From Swiss-Prot:
Segments traversing the membrane: none
UniProt lineage: Bacteria, Bacillati, Bacillota, Bacilli, Lactobacillales
Complex formation: Part of the 50S ribosomal subunit.
Name this polypeptide is given: Large ribosomal subunit protein uL16
Organism, as annotated: Streptococcus pyogenes serotype M1
GO biological process, one term: translation
Record-level GO cellular component terms: cytosolic large ribosomal subunit
């Protein structure tokens, strides 16, 4: 699972997710990609579930690039704890994904296989997605 090796601050602010992604909107490594059409936090477990769904469908053929990384920690208080008395303990890691960001890329397989593999991966994610192809240079 994807987690940072070390971080400067264990607890982060939630932040705002306004507008579109600044970079990473085009397919750059592979031939086909999965682009987010809405913004959301994606956990490291969701990224791993999507990766497994893709690689299983492709039967270990082709290559997959994961272009998002869960660098932001989120916190949660224990169940049954009253409000106040500080921020909760770090619970997990998320990747804030804005709309327009290409999250996964695939190469080395046919378009039909890539389309279906990315469709299966999109069902594991909390964002609406669309299939994109690499633009001819």
């Amino acid at each position: 699972m994807l987690v940072p090796k070390r971080v400067k601050h264990r607890r982060e602010f939630r932040g705002k997710m306004r507008g579109e992604a600044k970079g990473g909107k085009e397919v750059s490594f592979g031939e086909y990609g999965l682009q987010a059409t809405t913004s959301h936090w994606i956990t490291n477990r969701q990224i791993e579930a999507a990766r497994i769904a893709m690689t299983r469908y492709m039967k270990r053929g082709g290559k997959v690039w994961i272009k998002i990384f869960p660098h932001k920690s989120y916190t949660a208080k224990a169940i049954g704890v009253r409000m106040g008395s500080g921020k909760g303990a770090p619970e997990g890691w998320v990747a804030p994904v804005k709309r327009g960001k290409v999250m996964f890329e695939i190469a080395g397989v046919s378009e039909e296989i890539a389309r279906e593999a990315l469709r299966l991966a999109s069902h594991k994610l909390p964002v609406k997605c669309k299939f994109v192809k690499r633009e001819a240079e």
